[in-house]
Amino acid sequence: MSKSALCIGINDYPGTDSDLAGCVNDASDWSALLAQRGYGVRQMFDSEATKATMVQAIGDLIGAARNGDSVVITYSGHGTWAPDTSGDEPDGRDEGLCPYDIGDGNVLLDDELTEIFRLREAGVRVLLIADSCHSGSVTRGDDADLDPGMPRARFLPPSVWADDTQLAPASLSRNGGFGSFSRLGGDLLMAGCRDTEFSWDTRFGGRPNGAFTYYALKTLQQLGPDASYQDWFRAIGNHLPTTRLPQTPQILGSRSARHFPIFE
């Protein structure tokens, strides 16, 4: 059995005035953890992560995997939405990831990722971890780890990268989400928040990180070796949402996939 991972972190968004701070650290942290778990890891940071290179790298990873192999893709950066042109979205919007060159209009839509994921061979396990996007509000959890003066939302409004003609079919009143990512064809999606919420870019002990990534890694260290993804998700829920980090992590996938051992 082969285990492979791609960890993407984008802080720098030229032409948008919407740079982030914690995404490269997120990707580095996921990379270190996955390497410890026996994964061969490729990293893509900032200018390395254009739409073309992301599509190529994800396609190569999925295409090389065989029955029994495990694939993990982590993405930390901005999320966004674009008007749905295929009619498969009830809310009229396709969700998307924001590559480094999003300022040139190069959004990576969920429909495009779906086509890549459909190429996977039977028996390949795929996990997507997305620390990006959304908006919303709820109060509970523990803020003790969070530095003062933070955080910043990981959502890039379509008006930043698309012109009026591209946006005309959909309303600008709502923020982007990743609910449709549950249809990508992977076994599991672990996301930083609900479709109606933001994921937050913040700082812990002076070091920038995504809130979801920080607490996901923190809680994983406290779980036993036989813990499942469902166990992990419940542990993360003890920390998020909070008053200052109003994001509700999500896990999407089949019952059996939720009970897979973590990163096995």
Give, region by region, the residue ranges found by the protein language model.
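Cysteine endopeptidase catalytic domains of the caspase/legumain-like
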Residues: 1-264
